[in-house]
Curated annotation (Swiss-Prot):
Name assigned to this protein: ATP synthase subunit alpha
Domain of life: Bacteria
Site (described: Required for activity): 370
Record's keyword annotation contains Nucleotide-binding: yes
Oligomeric form and interacting partners: F-type ATPases have 2 components, CF(1) - the catalytic core - and CF(0) - the membrane proton channel. CF(1) has five subunits: alpha(3), beta(3), gamma(1), delta(1), epsilon(1). CF(0) has three main subunits: a(1), b(2) and c(9-12). The alpha and beta chains form an alternating ring which encloses part of the gamma chain. CF(1) is attached to CF(0) by a central stalk formed by the gamma and epsilon chains, while a peripheral stalk is formed by the delta and b chains.
Gene3D superfamilies: 2.40.30.20, ATP synthase alpha/beta chain, C-terminal domain, P-loop containing nucleotide triphosphate hydrolases
Keyword annotations of the record: ATP synthesis, ATP-binding, Cell inner membrane, Cell membrane, CF(1), Hydrogen ion transport, Ion transport, Membrane, Nucleotide-binding, Translocase, Transport
A Pfam family per the record: ATP-synt_ab_N
General function of this protein: Produces ATP from ADP in the presence of a proton gradient across the membrane. The alpha chain is a regulatory subunit.
Family label: Belongs to the ATPase alpha/beta chains family.
Membrane topology, record value: Peripheral membrane protein
NCBIfam families xrefs: atpA, PRK13343.1
Length: 509
């Protein structure tokens, strides 16, 4: 084997030329103690609050408690692989996640890493999980509707783009189902090319079973909703710090749409579990406990998250981010600490009741306790016209139904009120994963409030509605199109609806 001296000297010369004299300096500390997902670290004197740190085995953490002689950090992973004396280094970055349209259709964990086995994420940019919410000047009042596809919501508790509407109720009352139906209902709007009508969806699953999240993703895929949705999952088996972080990760992804003139919708399912995870972290970090052992800043935990949902004005791109936080109550107790906090932060609440659910009223919305503080400004003119009287009639029905239990001899007007109320309640029922387009909701509610259902037996209302809407689609598609395009109920449309209803009532048996 011949050795060429010239070649060797050239290689050595190239290596010398490309030799970098600057050393890589990183500030390091040592683990003093570790346990329960918390590490106490000596050193790291210049670390920032909320900064990402890296342990020697590659596991990431976040510095939260900056004390005189040590740093308290939470660990985003298993603490069993970290031991006393391990070296920890600063990364110099505050926790950030990938954002952009490249995330649509993907399932990620609380740090934005893909967990769906579809390869790496193509992200246009990264964004900090903790940023300040928009101030007062960049905002605009809520005026565009979010069509949920649920008659009971769009008519009685309307949600506008940029609103925060709480979904609250006991376990197994259909809270997540309301949110998923809203996602599925965006399919037609998102299939078009008009960016102002599209609504990109983010679903944050906090502390749920993996099987539940898998079922959710399957449902969204089967209904064609996954292509415009992002799922952020911090499941029950994930460490508490990831369950605490996941909502902020989700809102950072949603803010990308809001800040770029698009519209986003985010669901936090559910914030009770995030508060529990934060309580666990705070107690282990030895922060002083308050009411129900939650830390003193648990209100700020949720307020700084929900304030990031906003409707921006024209100068800031006209985008919006709508939030539907979910809170689980215990035995219908809405006066507990976390429910009252979140009720006071949001712009209204949808209250779901176990009793209604078991009576077969689904979605199990208690119309009397549910309110939307800003949504009525976002309701379309057509829906306002038909839904104006339904609220009053249902309120009177609830009041009368309570009295009617005592007396059997009711006068004709009371009897009429009770009959109408029973049929309207029946009309607002809707099967899961079958959201209705806005124009069909208008036609359906129009039939109810104008007395066309009064002669129909209560148990036939659902059949009547299905038959009537099928008739409208096949023979009166132009009327539905007129309502959809104008978003108003003109005199011509009203007359056409009346004649169609009169004809259908005669043939219905």
């Amino acid at each position: 084997m011949d050795i060429r001296a010239a070649e060797i000297s050239k290689v050595i010369r190239d290596q010398i030329a490309s030799f970098g004299s600057e050393a890589q300096i990183s500030e390091v500390g040592q683990v003093l103690s570790v346990g329960d997902g918390i590490a106490r670290i000596h050193g790291l004197d210049n670390v920032q609050a909320g900064e990402m740190i890296e342990f020697s085995n590659g596991i990431k953490g976040m510095a939260l408690n900056l004390e005189a002689d040590n740093v308290g950090a939470v660990i985003f992973g298993s603490d069993s692989q970290i031991k006393e004396g391990d070296v920890v280094k600063r990364t110099g970055t505050i926790v950030d996640v990938p954002v952009g349209k490249g995330l649509l259709g993907r399932v990620v964990d609380g740090l934005g890493n893909p967990i769906d086995g579809k390869g790496p994420i193509v992200a246009e940019q990264r964004s900090r999980v903790e940023v300040k919410a928009p101030g007062i000047i960049p905002r605009k009042s809520v005026h565009e509707p979010v069509q949920t596809g649920l008659k009971a919501l769009d008519a009685l508790v309307p949600v506008g783009r940029g609103q925060r509407e709480l979904i609250i109720g006991d376990r197994q009352t259909g809270k997540s189902a309301v949110a998923i139906d809203t996602f599925i209902n965006q399919k037609t709007a998102n299939a078009g090319t008009d960016e102002s009508k599209k609504l990109y969806c983010v679903y944050v699953a906090i502390g749920q079973k993996r099987s539940t999240v898998a079922q959710l993703v399957k449902t969204l895929e089967e209904n064609g909703a996954m292509e415009y949705s992002i799922v952020v999952a911090a499941t029950a088996s994930d460490p508490a710090p990831l369950q605490y972080l996941a909502p902020y990760t989700g809102v950072a992804m949603g803010e990308y749409f809001r800040d770029n003139g698009m519209h986003g919708l985010i669901v936090y399912d559910d914030l009770s579990k995030q508060a529990v995870a934060y309580r666990q972290m705070s107690l282990l970090l030895r922060r002083p406990p308050g009411r129900e052992a939650y830390p003193g800043d648990v209100f700020y935990l949720h307020s700084r998250l929900l304030e990031r949902a906003a409707k921006l004005n024209d100068a800031n791109g006209n985008g919006s981010l709508t939030a539907l936080p979910i809170i689980e109550t215990q035995a219908g107790d809405v006066s507990a600490y976390i429910p009252t906090n979140v009720i006071s932060i949001t712009d209204g609440q949808i209250f779901l009741e176990t009793d209604l659910f078991y009576q077969g009223v689904r979605p199990a919305i208690n119309v009397g306790l549910s309110v939307s503080r800003v949504g009525s400004a976002a309701q379309t003119k057509a829906m306002k016209k038909v839904a104006g009287s339904i609220k009053l009639e249902l309120a009177q029905y609830r009041e009368m139904a309570a009295f009617a239990q005592f007396g059997s001899d009711l006068d004709a007007s009371t009897q009429r009120l009770l009959n109408r109320g029973a049929r309207l309640t029946e009309l607002l029922k809707q099967p899961q994963f079958q959201p209705l387009p806005f124009e069909e909701q208008v036609a359906s509610i129009f039939a109810g409030v104008n007395g066309y259902l009064d002669s129909i037996p209560t148990n036939a209302v659902t059949r009547f509605e299905a038959g009537f809407l099928a008739e409208m689609r096949s023979k009166h598609a132009d009327v539905l199109a007129a309502i959809r395009d104008s978003k108003d109920l003109s005199a011509d449309s009203t007359a056409a609806l009346k004649s169609a209803l009169e004809a259908f009532v005669k043939t219905f048996a």
